Amino acid sequence: MRVTIRRSGSGLSAYVPKKDIEEPIVKVENESLWGGFVVLRNGWRLLLPDLPEDTSLPVTVEARKIVNDAARKETS
């Protein structure tokens, strides 16, 4: 799914146009943000693509929504 990641005064957020929702990112697997999963305030886990650390925001990427079992396998 397409997701726009942006930085606001309160931190990072993700906008999902297909669902018309914007949620703050509350947890990041990798400090560089890219190539790992993020957790949104609504509980969604999104697997972000591997991009360069210096990628400027906002940016629209193709992310994958993962369920809890898949997230555990990804991080094991």
UniProtKB/Swiss-Prot annotation:
GO process terms (BP): nitrogen fixation
Cited SUPFAM superfamilies: NifT/FixU-like
Pfam families xrefs: NifT
Transmembrane segments: none
Keywords: Nitrogen fixation, Plasmid
Coiled coil (residue ranges): none
Sequence similarity: To R.leguminosarum Sym plasmid FixU. Also to the N-terminal of R.meliloti MosB protein.
Protein name per UniProt: Protein FixU homolog
